[in-house]
């Protein structure tokens, strides 16, 4: 993947402004509410019966934050995201048996949460850079499935 200087700077800027403990839980909660079939991977998380229960679930919040912190590795290794996520891809494919389409659903939810957090700063150009970044992340996480 070729990254422009603007794209690199934009991705680093976005992650420098992220409130991980807000964005992570909101992203995973949104995914579990909007795409309820994704809940099947979180059976040990307890009460996921409705949007309020999901939003208040401490395990959802913790895992959402973990997911966003996991993206730090991609930010730090933008030139080698596929290898950066090789082990995580194997884990999600072979052990957890996560449908790889769910990575894209989560990326879409993150984009929405991020747009809400950044407001006017989330211009079309910023969105394009972010979505390119997330497309590479999603592809890398799904690499083991191919």
UniProtKB/Swiss-Prot annotation:
Protein's UniProt keywords contain Thylakoid: no
Xref: InterPro entries: Globin, Globin-like_sf, Globin/Proto, Hemoglobin_b, Hemoglobin_oxygen_transport
Span of domain Globin: 2-146
Domain of life of the source: Eukaryota
Annotated keywords: Heme, Iron, Metal-binding, Oxygen transport, Transport
Record-level GO cellular component terms: blood microparticle; haptoglobin-hemoglobin complex; hemoglobin complex
Keyword Metal-binding assigned: yes
Binding site for heme b: 63, 92
Record GO biological process: hydrogen peroxide catabolic process
Coiled coil: none
GO molecular function: haptoglobin binding; heme binding; metal ion binding; organic acid binding; oxygen binding; oxygen carrier activity; peroxidase activity
Miscellaneous note of the record: This fish has two hemoglobins: Hb1 (major) and Hb2 (about 5% of the total). They display the Bohr and root effects.
Assembly and interaction partners: Hb2 is a heterotetramer of two alpha chains and two beta-2 chains.
PANTHER family: HEMOGLOBIN FAMILY MEMBER, HEMOGLOBIN SUBUNIT EPSILON
Family the UniProt entry places it in: Belongs to the globin family.
Function of the protein: Involved in oxygen transport from gills to the various peripheral tissues.
Official protein name in the record: Hemoglobin subunit beta-2
Species for this entry: Cygnodraco mawsoni (Antarctic dragonfish)
